[in-house]
Regions:
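Catalytic machinery of carbohydrate-active enzymes
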Residues: 1-348
Length: 348
């Protein structure tokens, strides 16, 4: 029953993810949704500046608190600990379960810490371990589901009763400024609905093509589909790198494609994704965001990631080797398969 729960005491539950990656918060959204609509919990996210705008656009996150990720200094640990302790949490859930993070969270006043880890940890009665090894369904499920099931540790009977009632329609509401920014970007583009977004950059995976391979793909795709608009997503750190590559390979191509340089606000990417026909990207934060938003995509994935990071429409070009290990033949095959998948998608 959405919005209410037979669980009478209002719980206070925190997600600990003060990391710099977009994927950390995105992969946790179904977990946070369940915490709100199964337990009617007060949901607090302790995160980084990177994810702030996204978190504040999601109605089932009650509070977003920025923490310092670098806690090697005692004063930073104390500051983070004091911030967390203010919330008197019933549960805290670290997204990553390294020894340093767990030991830090043990020093807070959170009653219980829900973790999944194979690290050797000093026993604490406050630990609640999530064991996937005895659950065949979860062993073979995607990471969104595996993170979601950490919520089951709070009250398994209630979770099992209510989980099938949840729709997981996660709407990320962008603001007027984001809509206007994307409106302005598309102002000089003919037929914006015929746009393909390409996001070539990824910190999360080694399974990817090189920039020059993406440029070769774009060049061939432009020739085959001149009516399509190809948009490349960059940011402050990657923009110049992309321009240098395209300038070396084919400077004329720059005049026939579009580049959206994001300013760091994730909600710009959300609004852009909602406007395009399809996303082409490796297994990355942008792809996971498209999955949550139910946007069609073609993913450059390892076989492992097709299981653990499956996309909305499960449409992949498989890469059997990491980027640095790809031969010329491997790259040609991947580009050929991308073109085939794009043609297949456009026929539907």
């Amino acid at each position: 029953m959405l919005g209410s729960s037979p669980y009478f005491k209002r719980l206070s539950v925190g997600l600990y993810c003060p990391y710099e990656g977009l994927s950390d918060l995105v992969v946790s959204l179904k977990l946070l949704y369940a915490l709100k609509y199964i337990y009617n919990a007060k949901v607090i996210v302790f995160g980084s500046k990177v994810n702030e705008s996204l978190a504040r656009a999601i109605e089932f996150i009650d509070e977003y608190v920025e923490l310092s990720y670098d806690i090697k200094y005692e004063k930073d640990k104390r500051k983070n600990r004091d911030i967390i302790n203010e919330f008197m949490l019933d549960y805290i859930i670290p997204l990553r379960a390294g020894n340093k993070s767990i030991n830090f969270l043990k020093s807070t006043n959170a009653k219980f810490i829900i973790i999944r880890t194979k690290e050797e940890l000093e026993y604490s009665s406050r630990f609640i371990f999530v064991n996937f090894e005895n659950n065949k369904k979860l062993q073979q499920s995607n990471e969104f589901l595996r993170v979601l099931y950490r919520a089951r540790s709070i009250n398994s009977a209630l979770f099992d009763k209510e989980i099938s009632k949840l729709s997981f329609d996660i709407d990320i509401q962008t603001k007027k400024k984001h809509k206007e920014k994307i409106d302005n970007f598309f102002k000089n583009i003919n037929n914006p609905l015929n746009s393909i977004l390409i996001s070539p950059f990824a910190k999360e995976t080694k399974y990817n093509l090189r920039l020059k391979d993406y440029i070769k793909f774009i060049k061939e795709a432009r020739t085959k589909y001149p009516y399509l608009n190809f948009i490349v997503l960059t940011n402050e750190k990657t923009h110049e790198n992309f321009l240098e590559h395209i300038d070396k390979i084919d400077e004329k191509l720059l005049k026939s494609i579009y580049i959206f340089k994001n300013d760091g606000d994730i909600l710009n990417i959300c609004e852009l994704l909602k406007r395009v026909k399809c996303l082409i990207a490796p297994s990355s934060g942008t792809m996971y965001l498209a999955t949550i938003l139910k946007i069609n995509s073609i993913g450059l994935y390892s076989l492992h990631d097709t299981v653990y990071w499956e996309s909305f429409n499960k449409n992949y070009v498989l890469l059997e080797k990491i980027k640095d290990g790809l031969s010329k033949t491997d790259i040609q095959n991947a580009i050929g398969m991308l073109l085939f998948k794009l043609a297949e998608f456009l026929r539907k």
